[in-house]
Amino acid sequence: METSHENRIVVIGSGPAGCTAALYLSRANLAPLVIEGNQPGGQLTITTEVENYPGFPDGILGPELMDKMRRQAERFGAVFKMETLESVNLTQHPFTVTTDTGQAYKCEALIIASGASAMQLGLDSERELQGYGLSYCATCDGFFFKGKEIAVI
């Protein structure tokens, strides 16, 4: 059964971009609703040490950083729903966002911050090698491989 809710702005995704959008929107008294998706907190929740984020000179664990970002947005009024997007109807205004729970959220504006995911190679040993030389983020991990021979696929 579908239930409809009115929201001014809906944010799809709860990673760094989604949480930042939620923070700024909530501070502007726009009461955003954040649909977290299938990986609440985004890719950073499966990242160990984050050393390239400003304000944390000694680094911070990915899940801890995302928890802080979420709590900060919630403090100003953002509402997070642990639901996954099923469909979006942009043909009529207000827009309608429907989730896996059957909830339908109507909104005046929609921010899509659904993030990205690493493309897996499909190797048998791939999971074991993560964190031991196998990297999916040149920006994040390039520093660790300076002066070493590498392969880019």
Specify the residue positions occupied by each region the protein language model found.
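FAD-binding core/adjacent interface of flavoenzyme oxidoreductases
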Residues: M1-I12, A28, L33, F80-K148
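Beta1-alpha1 glycine-rich phosphate/pyrophosphate-binding loop at the start
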Residues: E2-T3, N7-F76, K148
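Short beta-strand and adjoining strand-loop segment in the mid-core
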Residues: E149-I153
